[in-house]
């Protein structure tokens, strides 16, 4: 699972990495539909969710360090509780935060 997460994060940086945790978990649990309906249309397609999350991150990024935060790993965002800020914009962030911190704990 870790390898998949890394592959996704490398593919679309921190934004995709945050989703990758939920995405891989959803696929593992085979409850993708549930996640999709919960997060909206972010989990529907990988490229699409990347775009949505990207715009969300860009909107909230300026607060900390603009684009610099984007290229940085998502670990800080997960631990920093950036989810609360993204929750209102995306909604999937709340779900991503739960599995994300668990993965980071390990």
Swiss-Prot record:
Q: Where is this region: Disordered?
A: 61-106
Q: Which UniProt keywords apply?
A: Early protein
**Residue ranges with Low complexity bias:** 84-94
One Pfam family recorded for the sequence: DUF5473
Q: What is this protein called?
A: Uncharacterized 11.5 kDa early protein
Give the originating organism. Answer: Human adenovirus B serotype 7 (HAdV-7)
Q: Read off the lineage from the record.
A: Viruses, Varidnaviria, Bamfordvirae, Preplasmiviricota, Tectiliviricetes
